[in-house]
């Protein structure tokens, strides 16, 4: 029975290691992407200028057609 728990523990540790190495490579890919931090790719927060009809506001924010700024709906 102890060997079963040992094998199970090793399997869980290997899965955790693989998951961490995959997320690390995805993070590295994001850092190497030159467009990742550009304004075109980033979403806009409340009060930032936006273009109505081209909603690039974050989350549940929308672009106001009155003052062309993101606001919470």
Curated annotation (Swiss-Prot):
Domain of life: Eukaryota
Signal peptide residues on this chain, from the entry's feature table: 1-23
Keyword terms of this UniProt record: Disulfide bond, Knottin, Nematocyst, Neurotoxin, Secreted, Signal, Toxin
Membrane-spanning intervals of the chain: none
Disulfide bonds: 43-58, 50-63, 57-70
Cellular compartment(s): Secreted; Nematocyst
Magnesium recorded as keyword: no
Tissue: Expressed outside of acontia.
Keyword flag Signal: yes
Main location: secreted
Domain comment as written in the entry: The presence of a 'disulfide through disulfide knot' structurally defines this protein as a knottin.
Functional note: Putative neurotoxin.
Name by which UniProt lists this protein: Putative neurotoxin NaH-Cpp1a
Lineage of the organism: Eukaryota, Metazoa, Cnidaria, Anthozoa, Hexacorallia
